[in-house]
């Protein structure tokens, strides 16, 4: 058969690029780990990791930095997927944050994110002595991520310097680091949100049910629809929980993540919705609207 008869879709090319990056990380680094946040991008990353090394089990563990404020359905889904795939999962919760009872209700989005996510991630990476952390960030998500390299260098304090990034020519990646330094690696850098959903549809990848529209109890707060996920969310004066058809485009800590009104209850519906929406998926992340808590400033401090 002539080679010209072979046809590769854009999803095939994205998949091949991501698998190449995953294999490169395993080959080049001493002790890599895959950051598993349980969202759609993490689900795609896990699928790619399994595919990259099949039929052998993945040679690297997964790491979930748990804030204790994730949606209940996320934790249920996480535990089920770990059992189904047989991957090794490490869960880290910042013990200092637990001792101080840090939470998004009392301390606000910025403090909660810094202590339970950023500091928690740095603790977990240091304890595991990981020199490469694979994440599911994409360049189309947010402007600071748009300028970040696939292999994103971090100094010994996990800090990112956006003005001092290494050149990446074609598909050649520089994995050299000094002791104590590390690299964050983003195999989905060139994917879009629509690409992710098309790939999930094609590969039949399981995702958290919260991505699909259903009647859910929500309160309208600060211009967002916040899911009443458990009894820890106190209602403010005048607030009333109401049942609306909503879904989530992005998942994080539930008091800091807004839902969107939608009837997209299937993958086909979600893909059709993606083709029409003019809004970013991060419109539902409360932390992005907090002064001084931009994505770039968080990444400079060690956020993934």
Swiss-Prot record:
Molecular function per GO: ATP binding; sulfate adenylyltransferase (ATP) activity
Keywords, alphabetical: ATP-binding, Nucleotide-binding, Nucleotidyltransferase, Transferase
Family: Belongs to the PAPS reductase family. CysD subfamily.
Taxon lineage: Bacteria, Pseudomonadati, Pseudomonadota, Gammaproteobacteria, Lysobacterales
Protein name, UniProt field: Sulfate adenylyltransferase subunit 2
InterPro entries reported in the protein's UniProt record: PAPS_reduct_dom (IPR002500), Rossmann-like_a/b/a_fold (IPR014729), SO4_adenylTrfase_ssu (IPR011784), Sulfate_adenylyltrnsfr_sub2 (IPR050128)
Source taxon at top rank: Bacteria
Pathway assigned in UniProt: Sulfur metabolism; hydrogen sulfide biosynthesis; sulfite from sulfate: step 1/3
Organism: Xylella fastidiosa (strain 9a5c)
Pfam families: PAPS_reduct (PF01507)
GO biological process terms, semicolon-separated: hydrogen sulfide biosynthetic process; sulfate assimilation
Enzyme class, UniProt record, top EC level: transferase
Function: With CysN forms the ATP sulfurylase (ATPS) that catalyzes the adenylation of sulfate producing adenosine 5'-phosphosulfate (APS) and diphosphate, the first enzymatic step in sulfur assimilation pathway. APS synthesis involves the formation of a high-energy phosphoric-sulfuric acid anhydride bond driven by GTP hydrolysis by CysN coupled to ATP hydrolysis by CysD.
Quaternary state and interactors: Heterodimer composed of CysD, the smaller subunit, and CysNC.
């Amino acid at each position: 058969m002539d080679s010209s008869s072979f046809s590769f879709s854009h999803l095939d090319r994205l998949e091949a690029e991501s698998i190449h990056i995953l294999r490169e990380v395993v080959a080049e680094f001493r002790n890599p780990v895959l950051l598993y946040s349980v969202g759609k991008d993490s689900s795609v990353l896990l699928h790619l990791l399994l595919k990259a090394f099949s039929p052998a089990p993945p040679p690297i563990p997964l790491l979930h930095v748990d804030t204790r404020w994730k949606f209940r359905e996320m934790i249920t889904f996480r535990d089920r997927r770990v059992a189904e795939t047989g991957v090794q999962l490490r869960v880290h919760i910042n013990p200092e944050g637990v001792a101080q009872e840090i939470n998004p209700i009392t301390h606000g989005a910025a403090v909660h994110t810094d202590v339970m996510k950023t500091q928690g991630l740095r603790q977990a990476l240091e304890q595991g002595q990981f020199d490469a952390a694979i994440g599911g960030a994409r360049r189309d998500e947010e402007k600071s991520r748009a300028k970040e390299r696939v292999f994103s260098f971090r100094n010994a304090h996990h800090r990112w310097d956006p003005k001092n990034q290494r050149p990446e020519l074609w598909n050649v990646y520089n994995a050299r680091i000094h002791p104590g330094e590390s690299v964050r690696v983003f195999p989905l850098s060139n994917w879009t949100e629509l690409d992710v959903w098309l790939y999930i549809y094609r590969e039949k990848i399981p995702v958290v049910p919260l991505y699909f529209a259903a009647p859910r109890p929500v309160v309208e707060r600060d211009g967002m629809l916040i899911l009443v996920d458990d009894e820890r969310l106190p209602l403010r004066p005048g607030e009333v929980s109401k049942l609306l058809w909503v879904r989530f485009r992005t998942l994080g800590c539930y008091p800091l993540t807004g839902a969107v009104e939608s009837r997209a209850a299937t993958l086909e519906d979600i893909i059709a919705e993606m083709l029409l929406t003019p809004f970013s998926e991060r419109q539902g992340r409360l932390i992005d609207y907090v002064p001084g808590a931009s994505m770039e400033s968080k990444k400079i401090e060690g956020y993934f």
